């Protein structure tokens, strides 16, 4: 056993002997004084152990580290019989209720391990923000006996910190970790309450211990980590912000969320990410990108916009979604073939469906009656079937490479009135292009039509002429090269002769 551990052991024995010694206590005042002295001794012993721990977190021989055990303090409310008492009572810091004035300063700037140890010695609860300096040179942040932080824990722009732990920490405001390039492990096993988790640019963070105790949190932002799972938030049902991005090893993401009141964003994680949001009912804004599979079976209401961009999934099922109060976008989903929006009746923003190369038909809105913004359809689809659509308040731009697409439904309105009320309709297919101008009542004000077949023929003639011109240029090219070479040779000869003569 190392010398310092031997000394610590005998120091502990001495303290215990003091408590176990038969003591005659005549008054409550003397009894409290004795217990306060014992608490002071144990506090200094704890500080001594923490100082050693900050410099040697594990034994050189790899054995168990006794410094990881909690130091138990003497209960100042305990009663000591005058003669019969032979044992003593110890309690954990969890029975403490009073907060020292030194623990209510509002801001604690930690420059080194000594600052942190001093704070722990005084405070089981900290009222204010704890900010770890970018100059903090230790590899370990240990919150020790601190149980509550009525404020934020902020650690940013540090290249030394390897591990952050707080075995007794139960609650805090915001946990902000940003640009910690050596940070690997976070261990808060007792954490139950946190207002915001904001983790960014933690490129080698791979281990987090929170144990799923958190049930209430406002914001979850996890960006640019090496995490393979974030299942420690699975008991959370409602958040304001849920933003998971650029976690390159995250292949599965299950969230038991039922409501997101501001923004839900998942993008740029592992290419094969499977996203399970099966319990989600309502969301304000949602953007999903770079996902291989998605489950949204219970989503019924989107209070703003809904976007699916550059995903790999082949099917998208939202059978309960009735209303989107903003824009609905389906963009650059190369494998998307099957969609189900069977209950959607109202999109109050625009409807954008573009560059989904496997999508042959736009026929998955059987009940859609109204679009509050514009229509933008582009791709290789050959059919548009929106049987219940009665009103589009914006313009319509439709372009397909398929020659089978018929634009008549949009460009030849029944009874002379179009369902498009936004001023302009433009529809292009492999057969023809049509453009209409309409007023707010849907009355056609002007029409223009272009036959793309004739355009192709004209392009063909121009192409032939261009081709002939290029042949002439190709035939004349060798002659031009020969002439240029002859001129250069003559110039070189005259240059040499001139230099010899003069």
Swiss-Prot record:
<keyword id="KW-0325">Glycoprotein</keyword>
<keyword id="KW-0749">Sporulation</keyword>
<keyword id="KW-1003">Cell membrane</keyword>
<feature type="glycosylation site" description="N-linked (GlcNAc...) asparagine">
    <location>
        <position position="135"/>
    </location>
</feature>
<feature type="region of interest" description="Disordered">
    <location>
        <begin position="441"/>
        <end position="474"/>
    </location>
</feature>
<feature type="glycosylation site" description="N-linked (GlcNAc...) asparagine">
    <location>
        <position position="303"/>
    </location>
</feature>
<keyword id="KW-0336">GPI-anchor</keyword>
<feature type="glycosylation site" description="N-linked (GlcNAc...) asparagine">
    <location>
        <position position="285"/>
    </location>
</feature>
<keyword id="KW-0469">Meiosis</keyword>
<feature type="glycosylation site" description="N-linked (GlcNAc...) asparagine">
    <location>
        <position position="355"/>
    </location>
</feature>
<dbReference type="InterPro" id="IPR036941">
    <property type="entry name" value="Rcpt_L-dom_sf"/>
</dbReference>
<feature type="glycosylation site" description="N-linked (GlcNAc...) asparagine">
    <location>
        <position position="77"/>
    </location>
</feature>
<protein>
    <recommendedName>
        <fullName>Sporulation-specific protein 2</fullName>
    </recommendedName>
</protein>
<keyword id="KW-0449">Lipoprotein</keyword>
<dbReference type="GO" id="GO:0098552">
    <property type="term" value="C:side of membrane"/>
</dbReference>
<feature type="compositionally biased region" description="Basic and acidic residues">
    <location>
        <begin position="448"/>
        <end position="461"/>
    </location>
</feature>
<feature type="glycosylation site" description="N-linked (GlcNAc...) asparagine">
    <location>
        <position position="340"/>
    </location>
</feature>
<keyword id="KW-0732">Signal</keyword>
<dbReference type="GO" id="GO:0030476">
    <property type="term" value="P:ascospore wall assembly"/>
</dbReference>
<keyword id="KW-0472">Membrane</keyword>
<comment type="similarity">
    <text>Belongs to the SPS2 family.</text>
</comment>
<comment type="function">
    <text>Involved in middle stages of meiosis. Redundant with SPS22 for the organization of the beta-glucan layer of the spore wall.</text>
</comment>
<dbReference type="InterPro" id="IPR051648">
    <property type="entry name" value="CWI-Assembly_Regulator"/>
</dbReference>
<dbReference type="GO" id="GO:0005886">
    <property type="term" value="C:plasma membrane"/>
</dbReference>
<dbReference type="GO" id="GO:0009277">
    <property type="term" value="C:fungal-type cell wall"/>
</dbReference>
<feature type="glycosylation site" description="N-linked (GlcNAc...) asparagine">
    <location>
        <position position="343"/>
    </location>
</feature>
<feature type="signal peptide">
    <location>
        <begin position="1"/>
        <end position="56"/>
    </location>
</feature>
<feature type="propeptide" description="Removed in mature form">
    <location>
        <begin position="476"/>
        <end position="502"/>
    </location>
</feature>
<feature type="lipid moiety-binding region" description="GPI-anchor amidated asparagine">
    <location>
        <position position="475"/>
    </location>
</feature>
